[in-house]
Amino acid sequence: MKGAVVVNRIINLIIRCLLAVIVFVLFLHSIFSTSFIGRAVREDGSTYGRTLNIPDSPWKHLIVFALITAAGVAVYRLYRKSHIAERFSAHAERNIIIFLTCFFIGLGVLWIALTQMNPGSDPAKIYAIALQWRDGDFSAFEEGEYLFCYPFQSGIILFYYLLSFVFGTESYIGPQLVNVAALAVVYVLLTLLARFYWKEDRQISLLIYLALICWVPLFFFITYIYGILPGMACAVGAVYLAARYLETRGYAYMIGSALCIGVATVLKMNCLIYLIAIACFMLYDALDSILFCGSDNGKRRQWIASVGFVILMCFSVWGCNRVTEQIVEHLSGYDMPEGEVMISWVVMGLSEAPKGPGDYNGYIGDVFSGNNYDTELAAQQSLADLRKIVKRMLSDPIDEGIPFFGRKTAYQWNDPTFISMERMRGRKSAIEMLPSVKSLIEGRGSVTLSVIFNYVQTLILVGVLLYLILNWNSRNLYELMTAVVFLGGYLFHTFWEGGASYTIPYFAIMIPYAVKGFCDWVRAASRLIDRRGLKLRANKKTTFCVVGIIVVVLAALRVGRSNLFHSTIALDDGQEAVMQYYHLSGGE
């Protein structure tokens, strides 16, 4: 039993320390600079999309935090005096969530009706191939074509191919409606997970659901038919069912979770990150059961079941992807190709690209075609190129290594909208969109949204930090399940091909932790206020938070004078970037 407690504390400490460091780095990015997709000029005078950075004021963020804290304390004290919690039943809460879900779905349908956008970029390729399959055209599998290079995309293409039998081939609305339903499922599941994590604090589940709905960057991805939201819904479903298994030890939840993660990886291979996170907790559960079991046969069966859960998930991923391959091979008449080598994605993820560090730059295709589509030769060249990159970064970490990862972090995580508006710009629409809708996508409305969510992003990161600080001694390791998914997503995309459209799901799943952190913070701040209004009570943890935030901001301001800080955190691309961000050099 003592060994189990020690293991729990060690693992808990490692996870919380890693989370604290990563979230703190993102927090510094958020208060010192803001990233967005602007325009850069080539030597020939043509322009292209490029991530630009403008300076931000940490003092403004601190003022917003103070105002939100004051408002939160005032509302919380009124809430306590009104005794609403005593009259607020679980049935009433469930009805409110159902109502909000219906409202959210209606809002999503309305947005789709107001935009009716055709897919662009990669989603356009994906959906075009799905429609080609409807016509019996499987040329995308021929040498050098899309599925010859990216066979792992056949799962999402098969998904849209099947959807076309339901919604028809003349409209893109159907898959977008599926995105709305998937996002609603994600938000409900994250709320249910919060109830599992913090059973003693069930009142915050409604606040978490409201916060998720109000955070609109992910909402705008409902028009982006690339498998992100359906895959996320299945993956979060797998996490939720795994949590239910841990709570009840019901084998039905184990089977459901394994099936969900299998389907998720068919839709989006990046969902393997969720599998790894769940597997880590199941293996910990097995270890915990072994250390506790002694002569208890029930505990012994429990660790065997947890290990079996991991094996079942791996089998499900293999099985679902294998079944998908066989269906596609049967439909197309082509054998599934090997595709581009995975190591080439790491090389690309550690290289410069037109849009931003680590973004797509054509390397994976060039190294594949340049070696006559020989995967072994392509892997050898990619490995050699990777060694050169690592050697260059290690030989000059101050000017090459650290600044690259700083700029890549900003590119992936420091755009307040997570390029959600950029993903809608320039796409054709089946209708003439209203001026207000256009403004929200590419005009002054988009600027207003970006400014607002710049502060919201900081508040979310501060909320997560507050959660970690105020719950540092919590022994409930399982409440970190989705946080470990975020941790995996951050580490993976630090080295893999990156972009805000890849990282936004991992940021969204941290919102429940931010709400929990702010609620704990507001309650702690309220306890500091005496009935007479000004007398402070001794509360070491809360005092530490207040002093810590002030010290961190002051220290960061002082450190901010260094060149390294300016090349990694306080990024600034000059006045032209500011003009572009605020649309000062042009109209709507």
Regions found by a protein language model. Name each.
Residues 198, 236-253, 286:
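Membrane-interface transmembrane helices that cradle and orient dolichyl/undecaprenyl
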Residues 1-110, 304-314, 538-550:
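Start-transfer (signal-anchor) and selected internal transmembrane alpha helices
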Residues 115-131, 135-170, 378-383, 398:
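Extracytoplasmic catalytic/substrate-binding loops of multi-pass membrane glycan-assembly enzymes
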Residues 177-199, 237, 462-466:
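Transmembrane-helix motifs of polytopic, lipid-linked glycan transferases
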Residues 220-231:
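Short acidic/glycine- and proline-prone juxtamembrane loop motifs at membrane-interface regions
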Residues 150, 154, 166-188, 447-455:
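Loop-to-helix entry region of an early transmembrane alpha helix in multi-pass inner-membrane enzymes
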Residues 50-66, 173-174, 178-179, 404-489:
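Membrane-interface anchor segments at the N-terminal boundary of transmembrane helices
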Residues 328-430:
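Membrane-proximal stem/loop segments at transmembrane-domain junctions that anchor or position
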